[in-house]
């Protein structure tokens, strides 16, 4: 019986050495450690991939909402400004050699001021000095009397009478040209958001007229140049923004490639 027990104990020691038991336990610890590292790497990989996918989706949305803007051509609408029609000016009075008709007109005008009949003044104003006084008074009255008008820049015609050497009286009235209506131009430019911005400018042919807009007498050509300059600047800013989005997308793609290469390197290292 003792012999059998010794034989069994020796057989067990020879078939399962202690070193193999220790080796198997150490190998199990290494396997568990490698599995924990692999699980951690996979979780980190999934986290970074999810973050990169979300960032890439946001970049794609920004790039889609900010596409390059085509150059927009401004639309010009020119509408004439309605101005009050000036009062018709009387035709210039033709020179007349009939002294009696001119004298009667002057007597009628003088009688309207003095509330007297022209027939009573006719025999009393026959001397030459009296005629000169009447003409001087008539011309002075024409220069000092003004008619109210809605256009202060418009000059009223003045009738001037003179006595010729032969005793005849001639009256002349200069022709006054009415002012030209100003030119009004409206520039409408579409905006990237879908709206429209309109700017109105007035170009008055009269050099002494003041502008009704807050453009400080800006010419239409200068206004168009300013609008085109602003559009070119807006186009350049938009192109820079789109380029930055494309660069961010390329950087994200390269970062994903680097992470994938790192993961493959860990896998080869584990093998």
Swiss-Prot record:
Post-translational modification: Its phosphorylation state is regulated by the OPG054 kinase and the OPG106 phosphatase.
Record field: compositional bias (Low complexity): 144-165
Keyword tags: Host membrane, Late protein, Membrane, Virion
Location, primary (coarse class): virion
GO cellular component: host cell endoplasmic reticulum-Golgi intermediate compartment membrane; membrane; virion component
InterPro entries: Poxvirus_A4L (IPR010396)
Signals that turn on the gene: Expressed in the late phase of the viral replicative cycle.
Annotated compartments: Virion; Host endoplasmic reticulum-Golgi intermediate compartment membrane
Extent of Polar residues compositional bias: 92-101
Region Disordered, residue ranges: 80-101, 140-180
Protein's job: Component of the virion core. Participates in virion assembly.
Oligomeric form and interacting partners: Interacts with OPG136 and its cleaved form.
This protein's name: 39kDa core protein OPG130
Organism field: Variola virus (isolate Human/India/Ind3/1967)
């Amino acid at each position: 019986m003792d012999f059998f027990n010794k034989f069994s104990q020796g057989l067990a020691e020879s078939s399962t050495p202690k070193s193999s038991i220790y080796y198997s336990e150490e190998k199990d610890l290494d396997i568990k450690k490698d599995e924990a590292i692999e699980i951690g790497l996979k979780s980190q990989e999934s986290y970074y991939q999810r973050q990169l996918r979300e960032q890439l989706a946001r970049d794609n949305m920004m790039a889609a909402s900010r596409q390059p803007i085509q150059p927009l051509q401004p639309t010009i609408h020119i509408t004439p400004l309605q101005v009050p029609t000036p009062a018709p000016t009387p035709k210039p009075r033709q020179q007349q050699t009939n002294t009696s008709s001119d004298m009667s007109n002057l007597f009628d005008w003088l009688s309207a001021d003095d509330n007297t009949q022209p027939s009573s003044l006719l025999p009393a104003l026959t001397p030459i000095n009296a005629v000169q006084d009447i003409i001087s008074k008539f011309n002075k009255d024409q220069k000092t009397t003004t008619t109210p008008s809605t256009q202060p820049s418009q000059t009223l015609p003045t009738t001037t009478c003179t006595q010729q050497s032969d005793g005849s009286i001639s009256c002349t009235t200069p022709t006054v040209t009415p002012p030209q209506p100003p030119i009004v131009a409206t520039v409408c430019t579409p905006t990237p958001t879908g709206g429209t911005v309109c700017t109105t400018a007035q170009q008055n042919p009269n050099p002494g007229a003041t502008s009704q807009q807050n453009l400080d007498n800006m010419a239409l050509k200068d206004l168009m140049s300013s609008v085109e300059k602003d559009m070119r600047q807006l186009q350049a800013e938009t192109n820079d923004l789109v380029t930055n989005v494309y660069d961010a997308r390329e950087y994200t793609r390269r970062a994903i490639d680097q992470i994938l290469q790192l993961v493959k390197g860990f896998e080869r290292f584990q093998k």
